[in-house]
Structures are given as C-alpha cells and as structure tokens.
A protein has these predicted regions:
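Terminal, charged accessory segments of proteins
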Residues: 1-205, 213-237, 399-405
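Ser/Thr-centered flexible coil motifs
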Residues: 211-214, 316
Length: 405
C-alpha cells in the first residue's frame, strides 16, 4: 500500500498502517507522485451504488472544502500541505477552472486595432485628433474617420495557458466528477511547460491581469496563478496535489451552523472565570449553533462522531454536562422562550435528511431534561453547504424534533 500511495502521505502523518490496514487521518483529496487519486469522505458517509451519485458527492466535497478554504482561510493547523511536495490550491483551482470553462469556454483575448474610413464603431477622439475636417458654411464635417476594430488573438499566450491548464484540470478531476475531456481542448495538450518556466508564466499572467477589468477575467487569472503555484513547488519526479483538512470537525460545525443557525450566542452566554488574588481571567462557553423558532430555543452541538452499532464511542460525560449546562445558563437569558431543546447532530447516511437517533439523560436527575441525538445525511449536507442552499433546513429540523420526541 505504501508503494501505491507514495511515502509523503505517511511522512506527513496523514495516514498510517495498522494491522495491514491503512487508516487515513484527513478528509479530502490527495494525488500522489504515483498518480493515485485518493478521496476520503467524512465520517458517517457510505459509498452509494450509483457512480453518478458518487461523482456528484466528490464534486460537492471539493466545493465544500473550497468554500471552507475561502471563508476560513484554512487555519494552518487544519490545512494539509505536503511541505515542498505539493499544495492544496491546485485541486481547488482546477475544479473552479472546469466549472468556468463549462460556462464560458476558452479565454480569447480580443485586441483593438484602428482603421480608416469605416463607419462602424467610430472613435471620435482619435478622428478629431488625426483627421482633417472639412469646413463648409461654418459647419465642421469629417469625410474620413478612425474606427475601432476588434480582432481575436487566438495565438495569445494567455489563451494557450488557459487551454493547457483546463485540459490538465479535466485530466486530473474529470474521471472522478463524471466529466470527459472536451474535444476542443485536445489542441492544448502540447507541453507548454517545456517552452516556458512556470515562474515566467505566472509573471506573464500577473502582467496580463493588470490589463483586465471584468470580475471574470481577473478571477480567471487568479485561479490560473493558484493552479501553477500549487505545482511550482512540486519536485521534478512528483505530481502531488491535495485539498484536505486534518480535523473535519471544524468543517462539520460550519456546515451545521450554515444549515440551522439563526441567532448568535454572543453576549448571551455567561463566561466562567478564574479569580486569583486581584486578577480575573474569563473563559468562554458558546454553543456551536442556536436556532430560535417562535417561543422555542434549540441549542445544537455539531458532533463529528462515528455512530457504531454497539453504541461505543458516543459523547461522554464532558460533552453531556457541557450541553446540559448550556441549557441551564440560557433559561432566563433569552426573552419569550417557553421551550428549550438540547440537540446533538451527528454525520450519517439515510434516506431521510434528518433522522432521530436517540436521547441522553442523567440518571435520577430528570430536571436536566434530555439531549436528543439526530443524524444529518452527509451527502445532502455537503451538497447544500457547497451550493449555499440551506433548503429550509431550520424548518425541517424543528419538524423532525417535534415529531420524534
């Protein structure tokens, strides 16, 4: 297995071999120096029978990590970059470039030239500056004009760079997201990097970017640079790229917050503190997600746990006490609340997007109430988060909770 994966992924501590099994310590994508494409899905995800669905799930995972990367700037401790052997930006940029190509096609640089005596697109400032007018009856008239003519520069280097990188992007990701290489990209398969150094190309794109003003053109240049920079550190005999996080629980919290949160706990939750002599040090207690529905309050904790059939590994004393305390301290701090519910949300796979799992309580202390556990379908959650579509999930959660308890 180490031969297939290469040694870098083991050196980075992203996977280890235990009893002849390889255990991955990240979620995301990894392309090794042996061109092995590894996809590691989050906990709770089960491979679908449909290859079409699998391709869609892979695309949604890419979009999810790309969104998290953009919004959270990938905390260095949570980012997987294989030192000098690759960069996570390449896969993210490759996926963006594929989507942009499908929408807009290959970039064509249109150059403006100026010609005489064409009545279309007259450039009046240049006509006045360079053409001699005819004056008749105190009226000024121009018999010759300077006109603007737009021509397509298909040999432009930026067009070639774009075509080459999009071709490489399809070659890398296409098979895994259900896309074949479009035939119009075949002409860009020539080894552009044999003619130019990567740093030269990056410098050229940066210069070209200064001449563009539309958002699409500027963003396109940025993504081309991201892709190339992601490969510029790759060793000569290596082709490692990755888009991955070591600790997916932070992404799971973001997903649950996006889907369910509609209020903030800031300035509501009281802060525990230490008093030592004349100094006081505060710590914070903030629930992951808070959802208000009329006179109901749902205190939600995103739990990135694997749910086993033998019930091992469920949230223990510390997690339970913290959640009970959240409800206890919020009882009199939110106005016009009649009912409060403690909720754990676990990743899972189910035909139902939200499914009741079970409940927890403290034996003999009924006054604390229950913590209700629900599974959230990973595939559907990734899709909604990736496409910025919460899809009435707040309403769905409220309905499922009320139906289940």
């Amino acid at each position: 297995m180490k031969v297939n994966l290469g040694v870098n992924i083991f050196k980075a501590g992203l996977c280890e071999e235990v009893n002849q099994l390889v255990i991955f310590r990240f979620v995301g994508f990894y392309i090794s120096d042996n061109n092995e494409f590894i996809v590691v899905f989050p906990k709770g995800y089960k491979l679908p029978d449909s290859e079409v669905q699998l391709s869609e799930d892979i695309a949604n995972l890419i979009n999810t990590l790309s969104r998290y990367q953009k919004e959270s700037n990938f905390d260095p401790e949570n980012t997987q970059i294989f030192g000098d052997a690759g960069n996570y930006t390449s896969l993210s940029a490759a996926h963006w470039l594929i989507k942009d190509f499908i929408t807009n096609g290959i970039f064509i640089n249109n150059k403006i030239s100026y010609v005489r005596n064409q009545n279309n697109n007259i450039d009046w400032p240049k006509t006045i500056k360079y053409m001699n007018p005819v004056i008749s009856n105190k009226q000024v008239a121009y018999l010759e004009f300077v006109s603007r003519k737009k021509r397509t520069d298909e040999s432009n280097l930026l067009t070639r760079v774009h075509g080459y990188i999009v071709y490489q992007s399809f070659k890398i990701l296409g098979p895994f997201i259900g896309l074949k290489i479009p035939p119009e990209l075949i002409e860009y398969t020539n080894q552009l990097l044999q003619e130019y150094d990567i740093n030269q190309i990056i410098h050229f794109i940066e210069q070209e970017r200064n001449n563009f003003f539309t958002d699409r053109e500027v963003h396109l240049c940025n993504k081309l640079i991201e892709f190339l920079k992601g490969n510029s550190s790759v060793e000569a005999n290596s082709n490692i790229m990755c888009l991955a996080v070591r600790h997916f629980h932070v992404v799971w919290e973001k997903i649950c917050s996006f889907l369910f949160a509609n209020m903030s706990a800031n300035n509501i939750m009281p802060n525990p503190f230490w008093q030592v002599n004349d100094k006081s040090i505060k710590t914070s207690q903030i629930p992951d997600v808070m959802l208000r529905n009329k006179n109901q309050l749902y205190i939600i904790d995103a739990k990135y746990y694997t749910l086993y059939k033998n019930l091992k590994g469920l949230p223990g004393w510390g997690d339970l006490v913290k959640q009970f305390f959240y409800l206890y301290t919020l009882k009199d701090r939110v106005d016009n609340i009649r009912e409060m519910f403690n909720i754990f949300v676990f990743p899972g796979t189910s035909n139902e997007i939200i499914k009741y799992y079970g409940k927890s309580a403290v034996e003999g202390v009924e006054s604390l109430g229950y913590i209700y556990g629900f599974t959230l379908d990973v595939s559907k959650a990734l899709k909604m988060y990736a496409h910025y579509n919460s899809n009435q999930m707040k309403k769905n959660l409220v309905e499922v909770v009320q139906r289940s308890i």
